[in-house]
């Protein structure tokens, strides 16, 4: 640490020269033991400008944009430091898998994906590094607060009772927001100052100033550099203080200031989407015979026996009788191997994939899963309207996401309060 600080002190003058009078990178901020350099800031500013242009937003003043980008880099650096302290790493194979999913979601192969990234002026190596950072930050956030995110059945029912009827749970709200930050324990004076600042911004918006540009210039929120765009969120995903407001807002309306844990917010309702849809699932009535290696049966014997049972069934032996005689799944064996009606996702993937591909009353060849070797027969299929259970599960997921976002914001606020942050370039302070 002392060596790093000594180096930083040598750079405080702003311009230093190496051997041969080569201009060195200027330090613009110190974050604990790390530094953020001018070149890092410049690169992120240029990237932000491209994003602002691509989204057809008004370009903010250069000096204001640089300040906002620096604050973003400080937040990222703090979370990357936490990832390092916790020994969190991302393997190259994980990055490859993530990029493949991104490409597939955009209907591109990897070659086309690489071309698109290059067209945006980003090298493939830079893109991979950005993906690595995003994954590291996601993982460290999950480690920091994920274990504390619990949503009970009672909370789901209470939400549906008081905030969102089941038939409306599919609606989405496209929001933008501006955050005027507060410390963890603000004084009365700090509260008043932040509220006045938020009210002044609201007045500017009412007079016609662009919400997105003001978000880029003034907001401390995670999405400030995207014009404060939160995207489309279901009601249960929104902070409760937002949800109470948004259901009464008209498209285009701006509400606030709204007091939340991390500051005062202004929110703009951009659009309302989604519609009430029925959710229908295919249930499968299935039975199986399970053989698995154990102390009395080595793997080769289990494979030999399951193949022998398969041949006997193919020759006309009764499946239920064979299950009662040979299956090692005690719970279903007494019922002739019958597992009853199962929903999608209830069985292990290898079993379900084979089951879904089988015609009715046809017995599968032996299928290997973590439990052993299975013979599978589909007895019947039916369609079931699962809308109520599905939407309750959606609400549970949305409430989990709401709690997670709020917990992450509090954690980020705490990280900042505990960190040593020195903005060396006073033009950026």
From Swiss-Prot:
GO cellular component, one term: outer membrane-bounded periplasmic space
Compartment(s) where it occurs, according to its Swiss-Prot or TrEMBL record: Periplasm
Enzyme class: isomerase
Substrates-to-products reaction catalysed: [protein]-peptidylproline (omega=180) = [protein]-peptidylproline (omega=0)
Main location, first listed in the record: periplasm
Signal peptide: 1-18
One Pfam family here: Rotamase
Keyword Ubl conjugation attributed: no
GO molecular function: peptide binding; peptidyl-prolyl cis-trans isomerase activity; unfolded protein binding
Location of the PpiC domain: 170-271, 281-380
Keyword Isomerase listed: yes
TM region(s), chain numbering: none
Biological process (GO), any one: protein stabilization
EC number, as in UniProt: 5.2.1.8
Alphabetical UniProt keywords: Chaperone, Isomerase, Periplasm, Repeat, Rotamase, Signal
Primary role: Chaperone involved in the correct folding and assembly of outer membrane proteins. Recognizes specific patterns of aromatic residues and the orientation of their side chains, which are found more frequently in integral outer membrane proteins. May act in both early periplasmic and late outer membrane-associated steps of protein maturation.
Entry comment, domain topic: The PPIase activity resides only in the second parvulin domain. The N-terminal region and the C-terminal tail are necessary and sufficient for the chaperone activity of SurA. The PPIase activity is dispensable for SurA to function as a chaperone. The N-terminal region and the C-terminal tail are also required for porin recognition.
Protein name: Chaperone SurA
Organism for this UniProt entry: Legionella pneumophila subsp. pneumophila (strain Philadelphia 1 / ATCC 33152 / DSM 7513)
């Amino acid at each position: 640490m002392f060596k790093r600080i000594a180096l930083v002190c040598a750079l405080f003058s702003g311009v230093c020269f190496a051997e041969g009078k080569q201009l060195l990178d200027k330090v613009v901020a110190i974050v604990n033991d790390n530094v953020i350099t001018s070149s890092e800031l410049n690169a992120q500013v240029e990237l932000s400008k491209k994003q602002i242009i691509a989204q057809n937003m008004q370009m903010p003043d250069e000096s204001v944009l640089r300040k906002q980008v620096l604050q973003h880099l400080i937040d990222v650096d703090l979370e990357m430091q936490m990832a390092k302290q916790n020994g969190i790493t991302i393997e190259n194979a994980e990055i490859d898998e993530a990029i493949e999913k991104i490409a597939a979601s955009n209907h591109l192969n990897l070659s086309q994906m690489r071309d698109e990234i290059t067209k945006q002026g980003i090298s493939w190596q830079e893109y991979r590094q950005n993906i690595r950072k995003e994954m590291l930050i996601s993982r460290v956030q999950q480690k920091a607060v994920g274990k504390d995110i619990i949503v009970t059945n009672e909370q789901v029912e209470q939400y549906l009772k008081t905030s969102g009827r089941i038939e409306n749970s599919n609606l989405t709200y496209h929001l933008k927001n501006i955050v005027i930050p507060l410390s963890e324990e603000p004084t009365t004076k700090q509260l008043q100052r932040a509220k006045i600042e938020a009210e002044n911004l609201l007045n500017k918006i009412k007079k016609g100033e662009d919400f997105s540009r003001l978000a880029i210039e003034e907001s401390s929120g995670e999405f400030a550099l995207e014009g404060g765009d939160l995207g489309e969120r279901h009601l249960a995903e929104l902070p409760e203080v937002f949800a109470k407001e948004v259901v009464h807002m008209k498209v285009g309306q701006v509400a606030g200031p709204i007091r939340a844990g991390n500051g005062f917010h202004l929110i703009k309702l951009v659009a309302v989407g989604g519609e009430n849809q029925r959710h229908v699932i295919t249930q499968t009535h299935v039975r199986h015979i399970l053989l698995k290696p154990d102390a009395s049966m080595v793997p080769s014997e289990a494979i030999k026996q399951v193949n022998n049972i398969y041949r006997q069934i193919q020759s006309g032996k009764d499946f239920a009788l064979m299950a009662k005689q040979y299956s090692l799944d005690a719970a279903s064996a007494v019922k002739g191997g019958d597992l009853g009606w199962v929903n999608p996702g209830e069985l292990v993937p290898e079993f379900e994939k084979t089951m879904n591909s089988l015609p009715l009353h046809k017995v599968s060849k032996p299928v290997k899963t973590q439990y052993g070797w299975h013979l599978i027969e589909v007895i019947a299929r039916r369609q079931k309207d699962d809308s109520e259970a599905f939407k309750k599960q959606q609400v549970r997921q949305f409430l989990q996401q709401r709690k997670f976002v709020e917990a992450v914001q509090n954690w980020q606020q705490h990280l900042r309060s505990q960190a040593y942050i020195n903005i060396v370039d006073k033009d950026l302070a």
